[in-house]
Amino acid sequence: MDTTVINKNTTTMKTISLKSWLTDIIVMAKRELLKVKHSPEKLFDVTVMPIIMVIVFSQLFGGAIMGNVKAYLPLVVPGILIQTLVMASGAAGTQLREDLDKGATDRFNSLPISRIAPLAGTLISDIIRYIIAAVFALGTGAALGWRASAGFGWLLVAIGRLAIVTTWALSWLFALVGVLAKGAATVTTISSFLTMFLAFLSNAYIPVTSLPKWLKVIAENNPVSHLITAFKEVAYNGNFGHEAWLVLLISLLIVLILAPVTVLTYSKKN
Amino acid sequence: MKKEIIMALAISTTNLVKNFDGKNAVNGISLDVHQGEIFGILGPNGAGKTTFLRMLATLTKVTSGSASIFGNDLTKDGAKVRNFIGLTGQYASVDEELTGMENMIIFGQLNGLSKKEAKKRGLELLKQFSLTEAKDKSISAFSGGMRRRLDLAVSLITKPPLIFLDEPTTGLDPRTRGEMWKTIRELVKGGSTIVLTTQYLDEADQLADRIAIIDHGSVIAQGTPSELKNILGETTFELSLIKSSQIKQAKEMIEQKFNIEVIVLPEFATLSIKVTDTKIMTQILLLLETEHIAINEFETRKPTLDEVFLELTGK
């Protein structure tokens, strides 16, 4: 009966289905990628940064920490990869906050789309950023002589099934920060602090055995350390062992807890 | 019969309330918006205009009361309601990094159009809004006025029958503002219903068929611009005489005969009379004629919407 009225105006009534739900998420992800296309500098943190980090860290500290650069590479290359990924995962929060502040989120919420689509779109487009980060960090490492001794297949497993999955799970944490924080600048500050803390108080750059005891306890229990250890185990020894499963389990828990909380906060925000 | 009346309404709200932290930002608004009209919501900053609009656009939950959009319950059928509405917020929310067409395609697809349909409709809209130069260029290269226009164009991608405009011209220069007004008028010709909030009285006066004045979350007056002007109920009738020597005589005569107050503005030999009944004006003119008091010129002046607004909001 409503149609008699609406027909006049030829409204497109969108049918909500699983397909439309997926399309919405893909369109939202595409939006993020188009932004990158127009401002390629947005990829700085996953391209130039890992290149510089791998070169500088290996050349600067290689000799001091392990005696020579070549011996330091197996330790530092996965470390920098994971650090880059963790830092890249922080960007999701900033993006969400900007959309909320600019009124874009309001606009999206007035559309006949599932309310999770803007959030999911951002987080999914991030996966492409993670892949780029992995290529640049490991590519630079390889150019300097780093090798994944278990072979290319295991390396892909380490990246795809471990590093990116874990980072993606972590990005939910930063998405929550983004939804809760007051402004985009605050999100960046909080994310930088968290990622710095997570990356440096770990085994990313140093063997933890060199640390004072209290710091060693922290570094060993840092989830990032677990991830790096697991990554090395898979990439160097071809063993997707209990450390790797533990990391995946933690990631799953993070998503199971944070995803509903973030989505709820995000929609309650109004 | 009753059902038909409800259907003819684009919006109907009953006692709509929005409470934020114990304070009612919207404090029981009941109003009807007819199809095909421009309905203006006028009020000072913080009056609850935007909150009211956000509730109608399903962006914020209704605390109590009810509302229907084209006969669909706002709280129960939010998902359906979103098919009928287009929203343009206070700030341009299109992606500045993206081109005009990319924005069109994204919003078209999110509204359920195929990429091809979205492209076609996007092209039409870019033409209609004179935005063709922004088709393949990032929006950030263009003026604020153009961004606003694109923002509006994007919300029209599915020809929504109901369009919400939240302060559509705030921050625009007078020329761009005029262009925006023109665009809004054209939309209504196409059959859309428009609800716009504004803090500019002249905007409401120029555009709106009907206006609700909102203050402290409540509607304090509602009607057509001329009805609202009639709230003050007075027309000012001003007469200037040729001979300023006769002014005192004229004042006394009119006051006596019609029992109304006459204010003398001596520097122009002018009498200013507030009249509620326009017939009195003719009688005053006749009286002066019979008494041989020559009139230089006269004019009548309706109160401006500004005066009504100030009177009602007590500011």
Q: What is each model feature region?
A:
Chain B
Residues 1-17, 314-315:
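ABC-family P-loop ATPase nucleotide-binding domain
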Residues 21, 134, 144, 242, ...:
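Structured loop/turn residues at secondary-structure junctions
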Residues 130-131, 259-263, 294-299:
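A short linear hydrophobic-aromatic micro-motif
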Residues 276-315:
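C-terminal coupling/interaction segments
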Residues 182-275:
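ABC transporter nucleotide-binding domain
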Residues 97, 240, 274, 298-299:
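Active-site-adjacent beta-strand anchor residues
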Residues 10-13, 18-215, 219-221:
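ABC transporter nucleotide-binding domains
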Residues 72-75, 219, 244, 275-278, ...:
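Short, surface-exposed acidic/glycine-rich loop or hinge patches that mediate macromolecular interfaces
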